[in-house]
Regions:
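N-terminal phosphate-binding loop and flanking beta/alpha elements of the actin-like ATPase fold
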Residues: 1-44, 65-188, 202-223, 338-363, ...
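Intrinsically disordered or highly flexible coil/loop and linker segments, enriched in small
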Residues: 90-91, 120, 124, 244-248, ...
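N-terminal phosphate/diphosphate-binding loop that engages ATP/GTP or pyrophosphate donors
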Residues: 50
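Phosphate-binding glycine-rich/basic clefts of nucleotide- and phosphate-handling proteins
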Residues: 45, 202-333
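Conserved Rossmann-like nucleotide-cofactor binding loop
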Residues: 21, 194-196
Length: 426
């Protein structure tokens, strides 16, 4: 691991933003300014991804993990593990090479990699403040508590002896507050890869010195909608029909099963399709389908383990649509030449329900706090999903007097967690 360029002060503590899509490490000493620690080369963010190579036996992380997989190395690629916390999958094991591993162990392996980065930089690595969404699981307090306990257990098992949690939007508020010179009422909008969280927080330079800030958090709400859901619906609505979704059996009366296509459009479900049984199913469905050429494309994805490459092309298309009115989603490899033009209008139509859920949760935060939209002084946008134009408009249109603060899309939570760690442990 490369050393950082300057010396880390003694008494420096860490915050870890373990995200569905990307993760960061923030560090700060009590009374000092927080900063992000480079976690992959010079990069301040790392994709929350692992690749277990069957070729050399190594475990790769982040961009290197994605690259190994995309280049066709033999092994197992894992991403979006955070979205499994609190679900039934956490009680299952999955085959990695010749071993079966629990998903908690896989999450722990990524957390260990982050802890090793702290140690290599000379940061005290036995204590950490971990970020968490307002809701890991919507409308299920027991499952939500289980998810937090699972994440804490995974961290402790990898050497973080003292684990504390802070809500991710609150962490983003702490960072915003460090830049203020007057009191304000802020709405923190954090659209992450897997969750969207909203907090109404009273911020001021004076209150920043208080140890207990609970009275300043007027409301926190959240919904299990994030950037990967936008990818999934874009894929289901516009891409998967070209791979068989919505097709009929040859009798013209019955639709083909949909679960294969839903899984292929969902990052953390794609690996479950790479089995001999699913491949046999695809061959059977090809023979029985009215449009076998579509199923032939799907079979190619399974046979050549190309599902994540297609999902990556969909995600890249979504990102381009933040600036462009239309884009092409392309997957061109031996045996499959797929290209599809998608407009921003079509993307927004496919994801309208997701935007509606975000708007409803935002309105709930204001109602729970007992404040009007006119009373909000600033809205802080963070998380990669906040870059989507329809989301940005939905989050700001109803706040007529609020200054829109577009913070570091991927770094503000990690910086706030570092501030919180310095306050708690310093």
């Amino acid at each position: 691991l490369p050393p950082i360029s300057d010396t880390v002060a003694s008494g420096t503590h860490a915050g870890l933003d373990f995200g569905t899509t990307n993760s960061t490490l923030g560090i700060a000493a009590r009374g000092g300014s927080p900063r992000l620690l480079p976690v992959e080369g010079d990069a301040l963010t790392i994709p929350s991804a692992l690749f277990f190579s069957l070729e050399d036996g190594h475990t790769y992380f982040g961009r290197k993990a994605v690259l190994e997989y995309v280049e066709g190395a033999e092994g197992r690629f894992m991403r979006a593990l955070k979205s499994i916390l609190g679900t039934s999958l956490m009680n299952e094991t999955t085959l990695v090479g010749r071993e079966r591993k629990s998903f908690q162990d896989l999450i722990g392996r990524f957390l260990r990699h982050m802890r090793e980065r702290l140690e290599s930089a000379g940061v005290q690595a036995d204590k950490v403040v971990l970020g968490r969404p307002v809701h890991f699981i919507d409308d299920d307090p027991a499952a939500d508590a289980t998810a937090e306990a699972q994440l804490a257990a995974a961290a402790r098992a990898e050497g973080f002896a003292h684990v504390e949690f802070q809500y991710e939007p609150v962490a983003a508020a702490l960072y915003r507050e460090s830049m203020l010179d007057a009191e304000e009422l802020a709405l923190i909008v954090d659209i992450g890869g897997g969750t969207s969280d909203f907090s109404v927080v009273r911020l001021s330079p004076e209150r920043a010195r208080a140890h207990d800030r609970s009275s300043d958090i007027l409301a926190s709400t959240g919904v299990h909608v994030g950037g990967t859901d936008f990818d999934r619906l874009l894929s289901i609505r516009h891409v998967m029909p070209h791979f068989g979704l919505g097709s009929l059996y040859a009798d013209g009366k019955r639709s083909l099963p949909v679960w294969y296509f839903n899984d292929m459009a969902t990052w953390h479900r794609i690996n479950l399709l790479y089995t001999p049984k699913v491949l046999r199913d695809m061959r059977d469905l090809e023979r029985a389908a009215a449009e076998p050429e579509r199923l032939d494309r799907f079979r190619h994805l399974v046979e050549h383990r190309s599902g994540h490459r297609l999902a990556g092309a969909v995600e890249a298309g979504k990102i381009r649509l933040t600036d462009a009115p239309e884009t092409e989603i392309v997957l061109d490899e031996p045996g499959l030449d797929f290209s599809l033009t998608v407009s921003r209008v079509a993307f927004e139509d496919a994801t309208r329900d997701l935007v509606g859920k975000i708007q409803a949760s935002l309105a709930e935060a204001l109602a729970t706090a007992g404040v009007s939209a006119e009373a909000v002084d600033s809205v802080v946008l963070t998380g990669g999903g906040a870059e989507v134009p329809a989301v940005r408009m939905a989050a700001t249109a109803s706040l007529p007097h609020a200054r829109v603060i577009r913070s570091d899309a991927f770094g503000s939570v990690g910086l706030g967690l570092a501030l919180d760690a310095a306050r708690r442990f310093g």
